[in-house]
Amino acid sequence: MGDIAADPSHPRYASLLMRHRLEEAAKRGMLAGSALIAHGRGEAFDYLLGERTTDSARTAAAQALACLVEATHPVLSVNGNVAALAGDEVLRLASALGCPVEINIFYRTPERMEALLGFMNERKAALGLDVVVLGDAPNATIPGLKGPRAACHQEGILDSDVILVPLEDGDRCHALVAMGKTVIVIDLNPLSRSAQGATITIVDELSRALNTMLEMVEGGPMTNDPTYDNNAVLDAGLQAMLRGLNEGA
């Protein structure tokens, strides 16, 4: 993608870089019209977190990674914003887990799918990774959903037992949970339908959450915690934001 004009010394350089990635992705036809609105909403919650990864987010990331490692058929699901903001991190995590990536978007058009598949395969080649990227020929549907957004791959999302779906919409999250899957979401809004309905919710900015998981992968085996409480994680995320709001008042 093109160079960013902002200086790396800018205190919010990371945020400016993410905005730039979205601008470039939009030019390539990778994003839905509402993509920038969704990102801006997430940024507002990140301000309240102090743009940092909390202890509760690390707890959720560790549990998520343990479930992915122990899974029989883990899958990482990618939409337009995820590809633009953290495509490399998704591919590196998929490589470490030995699992496929499936491009699965809410507003599905042939043009967007072509752009997203092209981008992810470009990044895969640039990173020198051997990762299966699905999405070009869906051959199944997610029960409970209608229209193009229900399309998926049998060998990907449909057969998965544990699925990471960052920035997922509420309907699809609930449909995947109803299928009996362990559903992991990354969502800065602890009150969203996806965050509330998922099995594991990482309340953190996307690239930070994925980099946390990559660091944990390199650190050695993870252990599934049978006492993990997602409601407690959501509450801790919300409390961290309330503290941030009070401190900034």
Segments predicted by a language model, with ranges:
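Gly/Ser/Thr-rich loops at beta-strand to alpha-helix junctions
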Residues: 79-88, 107-111, 168-171
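C-terminal functional extensions of proteins
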Residues: 193-249
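Long, charge-dense
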Residues: 92, 96-149
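A short, gly/pro- and small-residue-rich
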Residues: 170-191
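Active-site glycine-rich loop that binds ribose-phosphate moieties when present
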Residues: 139-158, 164-171
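Short gly/pro/ser/thr-enriched loop/turn and capping motifs at secondary-structure boundaries
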Residues: 107-112, 173, 190-194, 208-210
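Electropositive, gly/pro-rich neighborhoods at or near active sites that engage anionic ligands
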Residues: 1-100, 228-249
